[in-house]
Amino acid sequence: MEKKIHESLVRSICLLLGIFVVVGSVRAHSYEDKDDRSNVKADTVLTYLDSPTGKLYMYYAKGRKIQNNPAVVFFFGGGWNSGSPKQFELQAKYLAEYGITVVLADYRTKNNAGTTPKEALMDAKAAMRFLKKNAVSLRIDPEKILASGGSAGGHLAAATAFCDNINHPEDDLSVSPVPKALILFNPVVDNGPEGYGFNRVRDYYEDFSPMHNIKKNAPPTIFFLGTEDNIISVETARKFKEKMKTVGGARCDPFLYPGQKHGFFNSQHKEYFEKTMVETVAFLKSLGYIND
């Protein structure tokens, strides 16, 4: 108990001082992306686009209000090439127990639709707009919809907040896709010449890269990263935090996990799944989306 109190105090002080929080010490292995959607178990499945991947897998908030619940939308990782909503199924069930409605968004990838990263972002923004337009019937508060994701899915979550110029051609642009907060798991936030995936998005990276589009009134953000991540560097996280502060005027809480690799937070790595979810709940409580 004394150790936990000490760790909590150190974490709070670090955040107040704008310092990275560093937690844990054991390595984890990367998430192995899966394209299988047949075993995603949700309370209901919605269609937001008329396509095989235009689906939203919804998990209802448990034991709280029957309407106007906060919602978190998760986007799976896989380099815009592969992946499945299944990746975040246990995170969805975890947050639902705290009165959060959770949505696992499917979207087009290279493997399932032969598309580019741009189409993935189009779908992500269409999903956010669909939820906002239909929030009342889904018992969601349209002013309390957050976005989350891992790796390329973290990029999509962040890009729904910052990247205004890429939209699905069928979107109602009068509906904002911008989430109220971001929960990012080793996210791809820099697609510039020194960032991830530049060769695939070079023709439109300035409209596609979250780092290059941060603006005032950015949503508060929590950012999880392993120090041994071979895709997202600690320096990238530092730059993102600094730009969120100086340009976005927003809170950005980075948590670094020593020795951890890309995908360390996934549910098969029980220790770090739990650690990141505990911090996620604390973040949501601090913003008033979860009550004690």
Regions found by a protein language model. Give the residues of each.
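N-terminal cap/lid segment of alpha/beta-hydrolase-fold proteins
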Residues: 29-65
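Short amphipathic alpha-helix adjacent to the substrate-entry channel of hydrolases
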Residues: 86-104
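Short beta-strand/loop motif that positions the catalytic acidic residue
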Residues: 223-225, 229
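C-terminal catalytic histidine-bearing segment of alpha/beta-hydrolase fold enzymes
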Residues: 234, 238, 247-292
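Alpha/beta-hydrolase active-site loop
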Residues: 115-136, 278
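Primarily recognizes the serine-hydrolase "nucleophile elbow" in alpha/beta-hydrolase
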Residues: 126-196, 205-206, 210
